């Protein structure tokens, strides 16, 4: 699908991978709605690139319905959804203070996995009634997994479980939505230079980058966004989780 002229939704778009993805899609001609709970950050990014900022808690059905409705009224129904909203707290299952509070595990699952499914189901419901394009395609959904889905480290039980769920969701969703001409893909990024990592001391950033086989550096958000654009444009990419990690395989800690 050529994104030029089509409406797109990007969640978690106030910063990091989501912000850069929104910018790349706008440059490709898409009409982009930037969704985030951080509405001030989303507005700042939207003003910079020429998009529409909308507040949305992806774990809330009401929020998601309202945000998609507002985006649809401004840009028309979206043919592109990119799920970037997520959290990645590190906490051991059993620590010095005892077992991880169940609420903390549930929060990570709610945002990363349930939030992804919530946006996917609602966007797909809109896409299914659109006029088909080349190859009878009506839409494309790209979600964000993680290499932690495959090699979760100590302290990543909640995060790895949530991202493993996103990875596992991809193929059944692609199979189910194929009847409507909707593709479903996921990207599993490695260690990326998001604002959270860039806030670490330079020595820590260098150490993380050196752990990547090649190139020996942190991934750049633009590289993630460029892969999203490639997926959008490549109709035969469907039902796959693409690792974007410089051949990194995570150690236990």
Across the structure, where does each feature detected by a protein language model lie?
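Canonical Rossmann dinucleotide-binding motif of NAD(H)/NADP(H)-dependent dehydrogenases/reductases
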Residues: 2-32
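Catalytic Tyr-X3-Lys loop
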Residues: 87, 98-118, 142, 166
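Conserved mid-core segment of classical short-chain dehydrogenase/reductases
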Residues: 88-106, 125, 129-135, 155-158, ...
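Active-site helix of classical SDR
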Residues: 120, 162, 170
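Alpha-helical segment proximal to the catalytic Tyr-Lys
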Residues: 125, 174-176
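Residue(s) in the substrate-gating loop at a strand-loop-helix junction
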Residues: 146
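Short, small/polar-rich loop/turn modules that mediate ligand/substrate recognition or access, typified
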Residues: 178-183, 237-240
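C-terminal substrate-recognition "lid" of short-chain dehydrogenase/reductases
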Residues: 220-244, 249
């Amino acid at each position: 699908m050529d994104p030029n002229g089509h409406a797109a939704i990007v969640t978690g778009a106030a910063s990091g991978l989501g912000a850069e993805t929104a910018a790349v899609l706008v440059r490709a001609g898409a009409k982009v709605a930037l969704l985030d709970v951080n509405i001030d950050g989303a507005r700042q990014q939207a003003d910079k690139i020429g998009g529409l900022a909308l507040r949305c808690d992806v774990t809330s059905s009401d929020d998601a319905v309202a945000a998609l409705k507002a985006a649809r009224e401004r840009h028309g129904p979206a043919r592109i959804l990119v799920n970037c909203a997520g959290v990645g707290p590190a906490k051991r299952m059993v620590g010095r203070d005892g077992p991880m509070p169940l609420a903390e595990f549930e929060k990570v699952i709610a945002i990363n996995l349930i939030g992804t499914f919530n946006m996917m189901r609602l966007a797909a419901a809109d896409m299914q009634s659109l006029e088909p394009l080349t190859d009878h395609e009506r839409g494309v959904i790209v979600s964000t997994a993680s290499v932690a889905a495959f090699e979760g480290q100590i302290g990543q039980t909640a995060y790895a479980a949530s991202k493993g769920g996103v990875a596992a969701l991809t193929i059944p969703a692609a199979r189910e939505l194929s009847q409507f001409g909707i593709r479903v893909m996921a990207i599993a990024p490695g260690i990326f230079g998001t604002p959270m990592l860039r806030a670490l001391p330079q020595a820590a950033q260098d150490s993380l980058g050196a752990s990547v086989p090649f190139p020996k550096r942190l991934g750049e958000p633009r590289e993630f966004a460029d892969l999203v654009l490639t997926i959008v444009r490549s109709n035969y990419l469907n039902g796959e989780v693409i690792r974007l990690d410089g051949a990194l395989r995570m150690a236990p800690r």
